[in-house]
Each structure stands twice: as C-alpha cells, then as structure tokens.
Swiss-Prot record:
EC top class, as a word: hydrolase
Keyword Disulfide bond: yes
Major localisation: other
Keywords associated with the record: Aspartyl protease, Disulfide bond, Glycoprotein, Hydrolase, Lysosome, Protease, Secreted, Signal, Zymogen
Family membership noted in the UniProt record: Belongs to the peptidase A1 family.
The protein's name: Cathepsin D
InterPro entries, per database record: Aspartic_peptidase_A1, Aspartic_peptidase_AS, PEPTIDASE_A1, Peptidase_aspartic_dom_sf
Propeptide residue intervals: 19-48
Glycosylation sites: 118, 238, 310
Encoding gene (name): ctsD
EC number(s) stated in the UniProt entry for this protein: 3.4.23.5
Modification after translation (UniProt): N-glycosylated on 2 out of the 3 potential sites. Glycans contain sulfated Mannose.
GO molecular function, one term: aspartic-type endopeptidase activity
UniProt source species: Dictyostelium discoideum (Social amoeba)
Entry's localization field: Lysosome; Secreted
Length: 383
C-alpha cells in the first residue's frame, strides 16, 4: 500500500520579490504512515517539557525540492516543512558506514568559496534516534533567491531506515526560530532580513487531481488564482509551531464533542494526514465505518466514499468542510486499490491537540503569515 504524497521539484517563477515553486504528486509507503504517532509524541512532548528541540520526521508526507548550497552551488533535495525550523543536509564528512549519507548527496565545504567554518555541535532527536552533526555557514539558493551567510547543519549521523531510503537529502524548516536547534535563524527569517522577499509570508496550494500539477509553494506572495472567496485568518497561540485554536469538529453537521471548551491545532506541511487524540480518532473512524487495522482506518470497499458524511473543522468561527473525497485516500500498491481514512490517532498527553496536515491543506489554500503571527485558510481551487 502506498500513500499519496506531494513532491516538490525545482521550477521557479520570480515575480516582484516573490518566489513560486510548482509541486508534483508522488507516493510513500503505508508502513511509514504508522510512525506518525511516535513522531509527534516525541516532537510535542519535548516542547511541553520546555526544550527548544524540534522533533520531526517525514516518512508520511514529503514536500521536497531542489536547493543549492555554496559557490558554486551543490544541489540537494530538501523537505519544506512547517513543523521544524532548521536546515540540515548530509556532510561529506559523514562516515561511509552511515547508509543515509552514502545514498544521498553530501555537502563538501572544501568545494565552496563562500563556506565559513563554525563547528558547533548539532543534534535533533527523532523517534528512531538522533540526527547529529555540526554547524556550518554558506550561501543557500532557492530558485533565484540566494540567502547569504546561512547557518545550517552538516549531518554525520542519521537514524533509521526512513532516512536511508528517503527521496530527499535533508530538511528545510519553516517554523519559528524559538524551536530552532542552537537558535539558528531559519532560512525564511534570513530571506526577510536580507530583503529577498517583500512580504512576510509564504503559502501552499496543493492539488489532489490525478495527473495534474501537484501544487505550489510561494515565498513572499499569495496566488489569488489558487483559491476562491475570502481568506480566514486565525491568530497563533504560540510562536513555536504554526499553532492556533480549533473551535470544533463536526460529523455530518453535528458536533462530535471532541473539543469540549476548545482544541489546539498545528498546521503542518510535513504530515499527510489529520491527526488527533487516539480516543477521538478511533470513535471518528468507527462512526465512518472504517475497520481499525494497526491504528489506522481502512474501508472495506472504496464504493462507500459516496455514502460517507462530510466532516467539518471550525477555525476562527468559520466552518471548513471536508467531503469524503477529500478525507479518504484512495491508494494503490501492487495492483490493489484500497481506501484509507485520512484521520490518524496519536497519544500526546496534551489534551485536545490536533495536527492539520495535507488532507486539510489540499482542500484549503494555506497562508503562513509570519509578520502578523497568523495562519489563513481559503477554499482551494482544484483542477
């Protein structure tokens, strides 16, 4: 079984100090989806404990695109992730015994005329172990935008097979500096401080139309042709992840009672699903008629999509409706097609905490407004 994911390839259009990067569809294994609970449990528990180390993984969804580092540029594919804040890539100094380094592009500081040594130790703790290395400084180019003097990590150890066979080389985080390892300014911060983009925001449009352009990531701009109606903004509750209040969750127009007084949610481009408390998601999937296998909802027959109810997520007083075609993932592996629920249960011990991933972002054009500390949603135009 494979999951639909979205892969970001380098292709850029620069308009008035803005950068737009088209996206394409790809697939990832079903097994990777099952690691979502462990990933987020580690990530948010660390935050709750007062640490500033972001913990994330990307097996379940991958937005990756080409960047270059150094002069002349050395090419890498990186995940663009709103759930972390650091940039890291494999180092040429990584031992050949580290498979993840051996199978991916590696940064060679000796080949760059703009490299500046730093050497500070760098570690991120993942569910499968620690990614460790050291900090370096160099120019980073995304499309036609070159960020000078960017601090990033050269990885010399990467944990688990998820990194060994990933389609990406490294990760480019798009969350806040407050959760950045070693308090390193994220790439988007430096885009702003160096005047490379004129607006303090970036936005995602994702398409789930088979065979169509997978979407786009825009730095410094909002593409008015990719959504309809108004953008509804919700203020952030923390300047860590892109976190905000989620008012309610309804099934077929009736509140499910999941939120009580309120829920908190994170909008994360590094997660393909909508994730929530295990008990709530189990009840939801059972109500939808999905069979729970290995913690995920599986429908016995894809024809049931036509009989399932809409679900509604309320944010900032606005109801954001998801139809069955939007929250059910129809996936094929080895010639067999199955339909999976787009809702995954997680145990965080943090109350009513939800993660709105690609299932939600593909239905609603999403604006990450750093300057005004808010996230905006509008009905995405598909097709």
């Amino acid at each position: 079984m494979k999951l639909l994911i979205l892969t970001l390839f380098l292709a850029t259009i620069v308009l008035a100090q803005a950068l737009t990067v088209p996206l394409n569809f790809h697939q990832a294994s079903r097994e990777s989806r099952r690691r979502v609970p462990q990933k987020w449990s580690n990530r948010l528990s660390a935050l709750n404990a007062g640490t500033t180390i972001p913990i994330s993984d990307f097996e379940d969804a991958q937005y990756y695109g080409a960047i270059t580092i150094g002069t002349p540029g050395q090419a890498f594919k990186v995940v663009f992730d709103t759930g972390s804040s650091n940039l890291w890539i494999p180092s040429k100094k990584c031992p050949i015994t580290v498979v993840a380094c051996d199978l991916h592009n590696k940064y060679n500081s000796g080949a760059s005329s703009t490299y500046v040594a730093n050497g500070t130790d760098f570690t991120i703790q993942y569910g499968s172990g620690a990614m460790s290395g050291f900090v370096s400084q160099d120019s980073v180019t995304v499309g036609s935008l070159t960020v000078k003097d960017q601090l990033f990590a050269e990885a010399t150890a990467e944990p688990g097979i998820a990194f060994d066979f990933a389609k990406f080389d490294g990760i480019l985080g798009l969350a806040f500096q407050s959760i950045s390892v070693n308090s390193i300014p994220p790439v988007f911060y430096n885009m702003l401080s160096q005047g490379l983009v004129s607006s303090t925001l970036f936005s995602f449009w994702l398409s789930r139309t088979p065979g169509a352009n997978g979407g786009e990531l825009s730095f410094g701009s909002i593409d008015n042709t990719k959504y309809t109606g108004d953008i509804t903004y919700v203020p952030l509750t923390n300047e860590t992840y892109w976190e905000f209040v989620m008012d309610d969750f309804a099934i077929d127009g009736q509140s499910a009672g999941f939120c009580g007084t309120t829920c908190h949610a994170i909008c994360d481009s590094g997660t393909s699903l909508i994730a929530g408390p295990m008990a709530d998601i189990t009840a939801l999937n059972e109500k939808l008629g999905a069979v729970i296998l290995n913690g995920e909802g599986v429908f016995s027959d894809c024809s049931v999509i036509n009989t399932l109810p809409n679900v509604t997520i309320t944010v900032a007083g606005r109801e954001f409706v998801l139809t069955p075609k939007e929250y059910v993932l129809e996936v094929t592996e080895f010639g067999k097609t199955e339909c999976l629920s787009g809702f995954m249960g997680i145990e965080l011990n943090m109350g009513n905490f939800w993660i709105l991933g690609d299932v939600f972002i593909s239905a609603y054009y999403t604006v990450f407004d750093f300057g005004n500390k808010q996230v905006g949603f509008a009905t995405a135009i598909q097709g």
